[in-house]
Amino acid sequence: MNIDIKLHKDDLPDDIKLGNVIAVDGEFMGLDVRRDPLCLIQISTGNSDAHIIQLDRSKYNAPNLVKIFSDQSITKIFHFGRADMAHIKHYLKTDTNNILDTKIASKLARSYSDNHSLKTLIKELINIDISKQFQSSDFGGELTPAQLKYCANDVIYLHKIHDELIKILIREKREELYKDCLKFLKTRVKLDLALFKDDIWSH
């Protein structure tokens, strides 16, 4: 597959049109939201394209991104959006509205498996192998072509994967349960940022 990768500095261009359903991912220096800064945002329209935004970590001034994330009319597809949304909330100071999540969908649809990684879903649902070699990588500096391709792979398949998972959820009568889980996702992010890491429902 030929992927159209565009690297943007600081923010998306003012005149860009991405449509009403986008796939989103973020790259951080680690998983501790207070310690490990948000470095990149990747966005795809689902048409073999990836817009990779290298954020200015000295000020995090990205009004075009903020507008997209907060826009209720634009659907955002994540894979484990919990981590991405926490970093977006902490560094870009905005909620992310109108969310879908392939990891949550997979856990409800693919109850026959304990593996819900993006690599596994891409292989099983659309029969494409991707490399996760750069999953643990320094995204804080200049990006190599291999890193850019890795970042693109994290978003370009999310539309198709989500479509396939929804088919299973509908067949197994679990779609409403999925929708209810999505409603709680923003609250789960708020709990994470307030340092309530444990399952709030556990004994």
Predicted regions mapped to residue ranges:
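DEDD superfamily 3′-5′ metal-dependent exonuclease/proofreading module
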Residues: M1-H203
